[in-house]
Structures are given as C-alpha cells and as structure tokens.
A protein has these predicted regions:
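Noncatalytic alpha-helical scaffold of FAD-dependent oxidoreductases
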Residues: 1-186
C-alpha cells in the first residue's frame, strides 16, 4: 500500500519483529519503545513528501485495520532515534550470545508465508529458538537470524547450525527465493 501511494518517494520500508525490538530495548542504553507492543513494526522513510499525505495515509491504514498504531517523526532527532532502533538490532543480538544469521530474499508477497513456515519448522525442530527477523522488505530482503534458546550454551547452539541452515534454505527455495540476497550471492 505504501509503495502504491508514494512510489519513488518511499525510500525505505524496514520490517522489524517484536523479538528484534525487544533485544534493542533490553541491550542498547537509552532505547525507547516508539509505540504500543505489536508482533511487527515497519519503519518507513519518505522523501519530498509533506506531513499531511503521510498522516492521511497512516490514518487510512489504521481505519481499515491494516495498521494498529503509528508514529510519525516530528523532528530530525526523533527520526534518528527511530532509525537507531533498526540499526542497533545486530549489536543488541550480539549481547545475547551466538546467532545463526541468514540474509534471504523471497518475493515480497511471500514474506508472510516464509516467516510462518520457517518459524514453525525451526520452533518444531529447536524448541525455544529465538527468531530475530528484520530487514528491507520493500525489495524482499530479510535478515533472518536465530538466537539460542535462553538456557542453551553457545557450543550446543553452534552444533545445530547445519540443520538450522537446511530448514531456512529449504524454505527460501520452496518460495522461489535466494540466500545471501542483500550481498548478491546465491
């Protein structure tokens, strides 16, 4: 809906999971939750668009139930704070221990299906695994990182990497996607 409404004026469209945001809030000092708790958040950036069209677009999305809540940065400083939440995800994840990281791409329309299928398969195979998903969904790219279950040691989690990778890669390929998407490999 954002791309249809704003076309080239939509310069960023980042998906952030609650798990990713929680890591930032927990591990990065001075981070603040920008809005009510939700399973997913989108950080969108617009160029050369006044506030009114964005406010109207957001109000329409909320009215029709596509969006639960929203925040529009009122200053450059507030925009910087919002972007810091996205930019600090990887750093926040490091504090929690070892991660198994993936950079995948699937057709934009299939991102929800990828998340549902991969999450379910991984949680079935590795109860307690923590999925930290975020990324540039405007072009189908997604950082799909897995953190160890809270009680598991790094070495045990690292040993599961081949099976974790197989599950993620099989799901990506089943949806006509690719791995190492952002970096041009695969």
């Amino acid at each position: 809906a954002a791309k249809n409404s704003f076309d080239a004026q939509l310069t960023a469209f980042e998906l952030i999971s609650e798990a990713a945001l929680e890591l930032v809030l927990k591990n990065i000092p001075d981070s603040q939750r920008p809005t009510a708790i939700s399973p997913w958040y989108v950080l969108a950036e617009f160029s050369h668009v006044g506030a009114a069209p964005i406010e109207n677009w957001l109000a329409t999305r909320i009215e029709c139930g596509e969006v639960a809540d929203g925040v529009i940065a009122q200053s450059a400083a507030q925009a910087k704070q919002l972007w810091a939440l996205r930019e600090n995800i990887s750093e926040a994840q490091k504090v929690e221990g070892v991660s198994i990281k993936h950079d995948v791409a699937v057709p934009v329309s299939r991102i929800p299906e990828f998340l549902a299928r991969a999450d379910a398969a991984l949680l079935n195979a590795f109860p307690g695994i923590r999925v930290v998903a975020f990324g540039h969904v405007g072009d189908g790219n997604l950082h799909y990182n897995l953190s160890q279950p809270d009680a598991q040691k790094n070495t045990a989690f690292i040993a599961s990497q081949p099976e974790v990778n197989r599950i993620v890669h099989d799901t990506v390929h089943a949806l006509n996607g690719s791995i190492s998407a952002e970096h041009g490999i695969g």
